[in-house]
Each structure stands twice: as C-alpha cells, then as structure tokens.
Amino acid sequence: MIRRPIRRWFPLFMGPMVCAFIIGFVYPFCKGIYLSFCKFKVTSDAHFVGLENYRRAFQDASFVHSFWFTALFAIVSLVLINVLAFAVAYALTQGIKGSNLYRTVFFMPNLIGGIVLGYIWSMIFDGILSRYGTSILLNSKYGFWGLIILMCWQQIGYMMIIYIAGLQAIPDDMLEAAKIDGASRWQTLWKVTIPNVMPSITICTFLSLTNGFKLFDQNLALTGGQPYTILSDGSSIKTTEMLALNILNTFYGQNANSRGTAQAKAVLFFILVATIGLLQLSANRKKEVQQ
C-alpha cells in the first residue's frame, strides 16, 4: 500500500516521463502506422490509399529478397554465435589462468559501434581479397560471410557473459555427484551442464535472432547491400541488402512516391521483430513455471 501523502506526488514525478513517452514513442508509432496506409512525399500532404502500400511491399522483389537474405543470415549467425559463445564460456569457467583478461578481450568488440566495425572489417576483407583480384562488394557470397564473421566477432563476447552467469549458477554438488557416479566430462556436459543452462540458451537464442533481423549499421558500412544483380524483368536488386537497409533505401530512394511503401515495410518489420520478442517472453515464462 502506498501512503496517501506519497501518492499525491505521483503525477508530478510520473507526468514528465509519461509525456516524454507519448511524444517520443506513442505518437510517432501511431503516426507511422497511419502513414503506412497513405501515399505521401511529405507527411503534410498524405492521403489515404488503403492497403496499396502493403500490396506493393509484398510485390517488391528487393524486399522479398532482403527478407530471405536476412532470415538466412539470422539463422546462420544464431547457430555460430551461440555455439562459439557457449564454448568460450565453458572454457573460461574451467579455472584457466587469466580468465578475467580473456573475458574482457572477448567482450570488447561489443563496445565498438557497428559503423566503425563495418568499415574496419571492410578494409580487412578487401585487403585479403584484393590479392585474389576481387572485393567483398563484387561477390554476394563474400558479402554474406563477411557479415557473418563481423556479427560473430561483435556478439560472441556479449553472449559469453550470459552463458558464464548460467554456468556459474550450477550447484557444485550436482557436478560432484555426476563425477562420483562415474560420468565422463562429455556426459556431464550433455546430461548436467546444458540442461541447467537452458534459460541462458533461450535468452541468447532469441537475442541472437532479434539482433540478426535488426542488423543495419554493419550492413550499411560493410557492403551497403552490394553487389547488384539483374532480374529477368530488367530490374536490379542489391544481393546483400538486409531488411532495415532496404526500408531506408526505399524511403530515401529516387521515387519519392514510394515513401508510403517504405512505411508499410517498416510496419511489417516491426511485427516480425515484435513477434520474436513475444516468443522470447513466452519461452522465458514457461521456463520459470517449470523451475
């Protein structure tokens, strides 16, 4: 129970925060949804066109390609990041010397901005590929795996911290009991360690998946969506362009009338990411109930 004298001051302290939330999030969000049903060059001349923007979004070959490219990227990066992060975390919780230093080194890339990382790795990749007469911007396979390497290098340290917390929460008595029962290290890992860090695995899985779909600045700096490919109808698409970058390029493209389509794409993108987030919350609640 909140005392009445304290309750009186609630509007004074909560008011500015609520106003800032409405101005900074609620109004722009609602305005964005409305504009996704409009055709406009500037928001002041928007006129309602119904579901036309959504129809054009689904018929846009570049948007469809960027969705499948992003989905493939998110799945591959999810597997690699979590396997490597868990392996590093497991190794660093085995009492090796200098483990704190190694944790710091692995975590440091996560503190560097995505744009900076993109340009750094662009120079690294081009320096290597130039010896073979090619560039990361000339081959979509190089671009894809370049983005994977960059994402893994940046995210492994962050996921490692979560896995270390999960590993350190396992009771020592449980590990000692497994050892007394004659379980090998491999059996202990699969039968004891991994089941007990499932909450950490769930969190890292959904974080990796969400980060993979939301990736923007690294994509912009490393490949910019290039190279181009020509479709059968004569149009061209960027082969390494991900969803967020596709939305930006659609909004600020040469055709100003496509801004409504870009807004519709942004709403679809929000629904996708929000769905992943809700699935994570649901999975975490189920784990809490089971425990």
Predicted regions and their residues:
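A structural signal for multi-pass alpha-helical bundles of membrane permease subunits
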Residues: 2-291
